[in-house]
């Protein structure tokens, strides 16, 4: 409903649309328990939201301009129903939903604002839920959302799917925002929870929406979806009921969601249809190698190193180089892995990255130098950002001292 109202009102009245829908839902909560649910609840909600929007605009003397557009929407409104998270054929998406996603992920907005706005408007998250997901104060998130909406209004950003000549750049912005959203769900940057399923699954839903629409479906969207699904399949094995972290090496692979893996592999097959190999394709390929391996030791490490080599050549990312070093250590031993870590270019960018000393600690432990391993574990503890990471590092250090 927010998307449909925003299309009718224009993106500069995004807040009006959002408030009108909230008013309609509140009215339903107050009336339906006593008067019963109307025969067509979606149409009823839209009509109430439409009237609330007009009331708000009348105060600004703009209702007359918008009433014809709202009337057209009232006559044709057909809101999408909820769909399963994962399925072989992704549900069709309404153009209004897609337009709202492009609006929230406009490249003019800062990356953190795109993710927050997408969760709020395209995902339906409350300010409180977003604040909890990112361990921020509600006031901080509320201010971020207000600034983002003001920027969209001031820059006269239009609502809807971009024109063909600008679709590529705009789609990249949406993909980047969803990638960040999923990463925050997969490994939260701070707090008591490492995995925030609700954020990761919302990123998957929105990526599936892109894959289901003819205007946005393309190989890199399928690659994004494949990457998300293949990682999400391991969620049940990453954290136990007490919040204990299990690295990939130590996970019980019987707990992996095989249906989600199959869905991810199908998405990866569809991603292969294009001629361009992107970083998303390579990351999804690495995730597929892990998903296919019966055990840590039986993983196709040479193939993974090859994929990391391609990814490193494409991105020049020091984080990619760290992950590549782990794969090298599985083939040539811990000292080779440590040498690969020492050879990383732009290593200064990793000064606050806890995974680097944690990996060094593991490799020194495997090499038999427990003193160096303990020192690296302590360094990693000083950088750990979440409680599960801190507990895991503490437990590893306790085995050495």
Give the role of each language-model region.
Residues 1, 20, 24, 44-49, ...:
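Residue-level preference for hydrophobic side chains embedded in well-ordered alpha helices
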Residues 2-21, 31-39, 138-139, 189-194, ...:
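Short, charged helix-capping/linker segments at alpha-helix termini
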Residues 22-28, 39-68, 149:
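Σ70-family region 2.3-2.4 aromatic/basic alpha-helix that recognizes the −10 promoter
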Residues 60, 68-129, 136-309:
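Amphipathic helix-loop-helix modules that constitute alpha-helical solenoid scaffolds
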